[in-house]
Amino acid sequence: MSTEKRIEATAKNIEGKLQEVIGEVTGNPSDKAEGKAKQAESQVIHTTENIKDELKKAID
């Protein structure tokens, strides 16, 4: 498990949520979309790390 990657992904998720809310409040669809994209990227990173963890368990 790469703790550093998970921390980065969590930070990106928080950043994305904030950006999405700012886009919603200001009526800026670009910010809202970018925020959602960052959240999706965060999920991909977390899923990748989960798969790596499971593969390591299976090999050991």
Swiss-Prot record:
Transmembrane segments: none annotated. Belongs to the UPF0337 (CsbD) family. This is UPF0337 protein asr4653. The lineage of its organism: Bacteria, Bacillati, Cyanobacteriota, Cyanophyceae, Nostocales.
